[in-house]
């Protein structure tokens, strides 16, 4: 997933 920063 490129939205890895959303993996809180």
Swiss-Prot record:
It comes from the Eukaryota. The modification Phenylalanine amide is found at residue 8. It is found in: Secreted. One of its GO terms (biological process) is neuropeptide signaling pathway. Belongs to the FARP (FMRFamide related peptide) family. Keywords: Acetylation, Amidation, Neuropeptide, Secreted. It comes from Rhodnius prolixus. Occurs in two forms, with unmodified Ala-1 and with acetylation at Ala-1. The modification N-acetylalanine is found at residue 1. The keyword Hydrolase does not apply. Its main location: secreted. GO terms for cellular component: extracellular region. This is FMRFamide-related protein 1.
């Amino acid at each position: 997933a490129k939205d890895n920063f959303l993996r809180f």
